[in-house]
């Protein structure tokens, strides 16, 4: 059946076994058996089947949809979004509604259910009897709730889907549908105002707001790939229709206030708006077209009458459209989602209106997040304060040996010819690893990861800067008295702090990267020798003449060799201890402790979503198990100090006892340079691995930062839009003047449906008792208003529209005024003149 309003169609789905996927996930990811939740698994499938079968506009469908949606929100705290089942849903809009879109995403399922809830409310409004004031109130309320549900879907659910929304759930489509629903809600309020007989000026303001809503809906619809052209034509026609209705009602107000020139101007604009709307006549239904034709007929008739009166009687100048004051808006509707949608989880419980939460005994998903957080902290403790410290001490020990030319000085003395076996082994290791090329390739890979991290971070920072600029511009535009929300940095201090911290990470990391590249550049020549052949090594290391070692030198050599062997044993022992700590951390499973703590929290704080931050005390307790390893690091540092002192003493004694010739010194220098080169190679590899891990971890941080910024900016822009609307509404309501008028007893209550065209017209004039004879205008004789000045009343009070009248002022006898009209005839007394008025139907006669 054709109608002058639209209803949102349902999205359709078919049956899938959600319980099967949940069973599989519980059995593989949790420490609990799926059969413990057999009843819950049956219930969740039943709830889904009931929800997807809501395809008719009946109020019973509301409870089915909100109950299933609440359970889906609850499951979001127990399971990840990709639980393992493809949810198929057929689009409600677009050019391919016969092919379903499927996603393994609980949030996608929730979005479709919430969309259908909004569609249900819109269809309930469509089905309401809108010929009565009660029906109009109910329809208006349904439309507002449908718009609120779509706003909740757009701002709270779709951004958390972690996947691209369907084509008919994108930003522009949802915004268009929201504005359309608000337009139809405002239209219901406007229609009720007409039925209640409000003042023409008030009805004009209401109609103007209806036109604005339809205009916004159309603007967003043309940017959507899903809204059909028929709907766009409908919105366009309604936008111009209500612009015409607003001007028509304002013209009636001008007529009442004797602004005859402005009346003509507004009627002309109303005709122009109607003609603009009629350009869509090929694509709109007969009901909308009939309303337009009825309005056009009414406006055209009034325009002819007004132009004739003004041209022949009043002679008021007709202002151009540009000089007409814009009609104030009166927005009487707002998007408001039901509490069962916005506060669904709080309504789940043993006695909650939405039933008992399912899978309440299942370990919450937040527990797994907490386990991940603990693992990160434990690994940071182990890697930085234990393993990292041990490696730093070892590096310092190697630096000491290198500064003392050890073991090169001993090797040059003990083996004056050929290559030491340790050097040959080191060179072979580097050749097998393709040492120099490996280092260069690793640095290039790290540079790519760093570039990606920087791009993601820059995107987040630019979004923050853009939002701050928008907020500052709005604050300058509206002033701090009206733009009362927090400044950007005050609204999101953590985001700005995180941005500065990440920038600091990049700065410090760049210094480290430059240092590693400098190390590679300085040691590149030695690396080429070490990765070459043994002949290259022999050519690099000069031989020295064989000499007899004196006993005193032999004694110092033996002592120094013993110290170096102790250093090697210390390094080996450290590697074993570091590996033991790594194994300990790998076996450190906090899951069971988290489950016990989660059960305690659920008992003490029922219906409160468990957050990972609630496990802080448990984290601290478990990390204290590594205090013994921290003590071991301190002991290792003490032992190293002693060994370093012994090495220094032994080397000083060896240096005093051993002088050596020039060839020995050259061989000693070459061997030490190669030994240092190998150690530098191992050091650079370690640095590269640290850098690789750093930038990979930083990728997660900057990605999370960018996502948080996107969510914050989206929320702030929604707040700004709402605040601007509130400011505009306050200004419009301040100028809104609505008051009750006494209705003559002859007027009857309208019982027939009020169409758009009929509602835009003026109620028929009532009968009046004549006053004393007086010159009348050429239209109809209407006495001046005698009612007292009405007082403003709330909008909910039924009102009647005043009859459009022209007040007739007292006229001085013998003096012409525009209200007297044009009269021809012989002169006479004032009394005679008052009875001889001109009849337009008789033409002009001269005597």
From Swiss-Prot:
<dbReference type="Pfam" id="PF13949">
    <property type="entry name" value="ALIX_LYPXL_bnd"/>
</dbReference>
<dbReference type="GO" id="GO:1900198">
    <property type="term" value="P:positive regulation of penicillin biosynthetic process"/>
</dbReference>
<feature type="coiled-coil region">
    <location>
        <begin position="256"/>
        <end position="312"/>
    </location>
</feature>
<comment type="function">
    <text>Required for the proteolytic cleavage of the transcription factor pacC in response to alkaline ambient pH. May act as a scaffold protein that recruits the calpain-like protease palB via vps32 to its substrate pacC.</text>
</comment>
<feature type="compositionally biased region" description="Pro residues">
    <location>
        <begin position="772"/>
        <end position="795"/>
    </location>
</feature>
<comment type="subunit">
    <text>Interacts with pacC by binding to its two YPX[LI] motifs.</text>
</comment>
<dbReference type="GO" id="GO:0071467">
    <property type="term" value="P:cellular response to pH"/>
</dbReference>
<dbReference type="GO" id="GO:0005768">
    <property type="term" value="C:endosome"/>
</dbReference>
<dbReference type="InterPro" id="IPR004328">
    <property type="entry name" value="BRO1_dom"/>
</dbReference>
<feature type="region of interest" description="Disordered">
    <location>
        <begin position="763"/>
        <end position="847"/>
    </location>
</feature>
<dbReference type="GO" id="GO:0042318">
    <property type="term" value="P:penicillin biosynthetic process"/>
</dbReference>
<dbReference type="GO" id="GO:1900376">
    <property type="term" value="P:regulation of secondary metabolite biosynthetic process"/>
</dbReference>
<protein>
    <recommendedName>
        <fullName>pH-response regulator protein palA/RIM20</fullName>
    </recommendedName>
</protein>
<feature type="domain" description="BRO1">
    <location>
        <begin position="4"/>
        <end position="397"/>
    </location>
</feature>
<keyword id="KW-0175">Coiled coil</keyword>
<comment type="similarity">
    <text>Belongs to the palA/RIM20 family.</text>
</comment>
<feature type="compositionally biased region" description="Low complexity">
    <location>
        <begin position="796"/>
        <end position="806"/>
    </location>
</feature>
<dbReference type="InterPro" id="IPR038499">
    <property type="entry name" value="BRO1_sf"/>
</dbReference>
<dbReference type="InterPro" id="IPR025304">
    <property type="entry name" value="ALIX_V_dom"/>
</dbReference>
<dbReference type="GO" id="GO:0000815">
    <property type="term" value="C:ESCRT III complex"/>
</dbReference>
<feature type="compositionally biased region" description="Polar residues">
    <location>
        <begin position="829"/>
        <end position="839"/>
    </location>
</feature>
<dbReference type="Pfam" id="PF03097">
    <property type="entry name" value="BRO1"/>
</dbReference>
